[in-house]
Design a protein with these regions (language model features):
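A short beta-strand submotif of the Rossmann-like class I SAM-dependent methyltransferase core
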Residues: 360
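Short, basic/polar, glycine-containing "phosphate-handling" surface segments that engage DNA
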Residues: 1-83, 175-176, 180-183, 191-209
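Class I SAM-dependent transferase core
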Residues: 68-69, 216-240, 245-246, 250
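Short, hydrophobic/amphipathic alpha-helical patches that form generic packing surfaces
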Residues: 83-95, 315-316
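Conserved S-adenosyl-L-methionine
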Residues: 234-345, 349-353, 357, 365
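Conserved ATPase-coupling elements of RecA-like P-loop NTPase cores
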Residues: 367-369
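Long recognition/docking surfaces used for binding and targeting
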Residues: 89, 96-224
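Non-catalytic, well-ordered alpha-helical scaffold segments
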Residues: 63, 78-87, 195, 212, ...
Length: 369
């Protein structure tokens, strides 16, 4: 009502803009008028869906991302890329499993808060890590907190406990901390960065059937700097991957096997070999056949960050069925197939002597080795 009155008191375009800026933080919607499922005057009840997302074809997205980092004085590019990969994982999971009710995004000052936005991201990240990499992430949602304290009779005690949990949950470094976070003020500063980056990709599809070079460009800018020289990690250029792939009698192997070839890269890094092989399959197989072949592609990666990068990369290439296992390829298969902490079965399962093709360029340049 107060906001309605402020609009009524605005006598010209300058005052209207001031009210919009101060009350709504310049919020606007990119849908809500011409779509078939929209009811008049119900713009806040719009449910974002996958079908309303646009194809990501803008190379300028990287420059916009870099601009956000400069704007907020974020110099740690590797950390920023790690957090961006986490955001991509959230979005890919959302597009895959929540097509009719997307959770990814900031829904404006009138319908959302920074804490709720991050809470949704943390939930999506937990589900994505479980689904794509078989990793268990500890997370307590706002709904869980409300449910567990629902029966608490003393309202003051309930609020105190909820505030303690909120501080532990949000006011510390986390999987979406582009900036150092250890109090409410820093949480809000980081939330501004997170909001801008989320909004950068919220209206675009990251899962599609065509090749997307955007993530590859980010690899070049963030992954190869420092890691290659300091840790002996090399990312095989796409051109070398393609050269090796073209050297294989792939068409002959496919014609001789009635079942899909089982393929493995036991040190898959950013997933270049896996994605190049999957792209090459498109020359010989139909769209219906491809999915089954993708399910038989396996990558093992010992480095935690790169296992996530590899999964994001395969999804953005439209090859989400590729299996990525966060494990040590030099360990026994029995150990590699379990999560170290709880002994739960990891995904995917690796069986000895079960592969038809090995494509890899394992790390070899480590000082003092």
């Amino acid at each position: 009502k107060e906001l309605q009155n402020s609009y009524k008191k605005s006598n010209n375009n300058i005052e209207l803009f001031k009210t919009w800026k101060e009350s709504y933080e310049l919020q606007y919607f990119k849908q809500g008028i011409f779509e078939e499922n929209v009811n008049a005057y119900k713009i806040l009840e719009i449910t974002p869906t996958f079908d309303n997302l646009k194809e990501l074809k803008e190379e300028s997205k990287y420059h916009e991302f870099a601009k956000i980092l400069r704007k907020h004085n974020i110099s740690g590019k590797e950390n920023a890329f790690d957090k961006l990969v986490n955001i991509f994982l959230c979005k890919i999971y959302d597009e895959t499993f929540n097509k009719n009710n997307l959770k990814f995004g900031y829904f404006g000052v009138m319908a959302d808060t920074y804490a709720n936005m991050q809470d949704r991201l943390m939930w999506l990240y937990k589900e994505a890590m479980k689904e794509f990499l078989g990793e268990k992430i500890t997370f307590v949602s706002n709904e869980d907190i409300e449910k567990d304290f629902k029966q608490l009779k003393i309202k003051t005690l309930k609020e105190v406990m909820q505030n303690y949990i909120k501080e532990l949950k949000f006011y510390s470094n986390n999987d979406f901390a582009f900036l150092e976070v250890h109090n409410k003020e820093l949480f809000l500063k980081n939330a501004l960065v997170l909001k801008e980056i989320v909004e950068l990709f919220a209206n675009y599809k990251l899962t599609q059937n065509s090749t997307n070079q955007f993530l590859g460009n980010l690899f070049e800018l963030f992954l190869q700097k420092g890691m290659k020289q300091d840790e002996g990690q090399f990312f095989t250029p796409i051109q070398i991957c393609e050269f090796i792939m073209y050297s294989l009698p792939l068409q002959e192997m496919l014609s001789k096997n009635s079942k899909a070839l089982r393929v493995i890269d036991y040190a898959c890094g950013a997933g270049h070999f896996l994605n190049t092989y999957a792209n090459e399959l498109k020359r010989y197989l139909t769209e219906d056949e491809l999915k089954e072949h993708y399910k038989n592609i396996y990558g093992i990666e010992k480095e935690y960050r790169l296992s996530k990068v590899s999964k994001v990369s395969s999804a953005m290439y439209g090859q989400n069925e590729i299996n990525i296992l966060y494990a040590d390829a030099l360990a026994s298969f029995e150990l590699a197939n379990t999560n170290n902490l709880e002994g739960e079965k990891a995904k995917p399962q690796i069986e000895s002597n079960s592969f038809d093709l090995l494509i890899a360029n394992p790390p070899y340049s480590v000082k003092g080795f």
